[in-house]
From Swiss-Prot:
One of its GO terms (molecular function) is proton-transporting ATPase activity, rotational mechanism. The chain crosses the membrane at residues 20-40. GO terms for cellular component: plasma membrane-derived thylakoid membrane; proton-transporting ATP synthase complex. F(1)F(0) ATP synthase produces ATP from ADP in the presence of a proton or sodium gradient. F-type ATPases consist of two structural domains, F(1) containing the extramembraneous catalytic core and F(0) containing the membrane proton channel, linked together by a central stalk and a peripheral stalk. During catalysis, ATP synthesis in the catalytic domain of F(1) is coupled via a rotary mechanism of the central stalk subunits to proton translocation. This is ATP synthase subunit b'. It comes from Prochlorococcus marinus (strain NATL2A). It is found in: Cellular thylakoid membrane. It is a single-pass membrane protein. InterPro entries: ATP_synth_b (IPR034679), ATP_synth_B-like_membr_sf (IPR028987), ATP_synth_b/b'su_bac/chlpt (IPR002146), ATP_synthase_B_chain (IPR050059). The gene is atpF2. NCBIfam families: PRK07353.1. PANTHER family: ATP SYNTHASE SUBUNIT B', CHLOROPLASTIC. Its main location: membrane.
Length: 153
């Protein structure tokens, strides 16, 4: 019956103190150096390069975001100024239009008044002429009537 105790273990086992255990330890250390030189250092270098690339990209992205925010602020200011300028131009155009309307209305009113006054003077002149003509005709008729009356006598 095999015993389960270490003291009673047969030779050639894992915990024998012959050259196997130190040889395995040397193999592990040697494998560690080889893996370190062939795998871990290149992978570590690639990881560091990638980390540097990511950090650089993030820094550039932050810089570009700051530039974009600055440009956005400037463009908003320019847009605000343009809107104010447009409102000012519109207001000036409305005022100019109102002034032109008032001037045109005043000119039309003055022309209408002048035309009305001219027509009134012409009517007065024609009325005076008609009255003078009627007076002359009345005088002529009166003279004619008097002559005929005197001629009958």
């Amino acid at each position: 019956m095999p015993t389960l105790f270490l003291f009673g273990a047969s030779e050639g086992g894992l915990f024998d103190f012959d050259a196997t255990l130190p040889l395995m330890a040397v193999q592990v250390v040697l494998l560690t150096f080889i893996l370190n030189a062939l795998f871990f250092k290149p992978v570590g270098r690639v990881v560091e390069e990638r980390e540097d690339y990511v950090n650089t990209s993030r820094a550039e992205a932050k810089k570009k975001i700051a530039e974009v925010e600055l440009l956005e602020t400037e463009l908003k200011d320019q847009l605000k100024e343009a809107r104010l300028e447009a409102q000012k131009v519109i207001l000036e155009a409305e005022q100019d239009s109102e002034n032109l309307y008032k001037e045109a209305l005043a000119l039309a009113t003055s022309e209408a008044n002048a035309s009305r006054e001219k027509a009134r003077r012409e009517i007065d002149s024609q009325r005076d002429e008609a009255l003078n003509q009627l007076k002359n005709e009345a005088d002529n008729l009166g003279d004619l009537i008097i002559e005929r009356l005197l001629a009958k006598k």
